Amino acid sequence: MGLAPLHRRQLVLAGLALLGALVPGGTGAAAPPAATAEEVVRRLVDQVWRMLAEGEVENVDREHLLAVVDEGADLSLLGRLVLGRYWRQANPRQRTEYLRLFRHYIFQTFVQRLRQYVGSDLGYVSERFQIIASRQVGERDVLVQSRVAPPTGQPVRVDWRLREGQDEPVIIDLIVEGISLLVTQRSEFGAVLERGGIDGLLSELRVRVTQPA
C-alpha cells in the first residue's frame, strides 16, 4: 500500500505547504505556550519509554499504549487530515471504521519507528531523549524539537507539532529527520484512495492492522 518514496526535500516542502494550509487566518485559537507543549511531549515520551522498558517492543499491550498516546496526541484529527478531501466523501459508517483502523495503523507505524530508531536497549529516557527547542509555527501551532540517541549511530531529530486541545496541547504530527508522518501517510493513502476509494482503503487497513508490527 503506497506510492514510490518521495525525495526528502519534496516531503519537507509538501509538509510545509500542507500544514501551512491547515492553519486558517483570522481569529482561531492561539498557539499553546511553548513550555506547556514541551511538557506534553516530555510526559508522553516518559510514559511510553517506561512502558517499553518493562518488556520487548513487540510485546507491549496495544490498548494500553494506545491509551497513553491518546492522552497526548489527537489521532482523530490526524486521521482526518491524512484523509483530506476524502473525509467529506465518506459516510458515517466509513468514518467510524476508518478512525478505528487508523488508530491501530498508527500504533503499527509507531512500533516500527521505535524498533528502527531506539532498538531494544532503551536505557534511561534522560540519557536518550532531549528536547532542544520549541517555536511557534503559524498562528495556532508549536513545534517542539527533540533528539533521540539510538544505541549506535548518530542522534535522530524528532519534531512534534502541537495544537491547543480541549484541556491542553495535543500532538497532531510527528516529523522524523524532516519527514512528516502526516504528509507521508497522506501520500500513501492517496494512492490507495485513487484506485479503490474509501472502501478500498478500509480493506487495506484491515489487513495492515492484523499484521505483526
What are these regions (language model features)?
Residues M1-L19:
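N-terminal secretory signal peptides and thylakoid transit peptides that target proteins
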Residues R80, R115-D121, A191-L193:
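Juxtamembrane/interface motifs at transmembrane-helix termini
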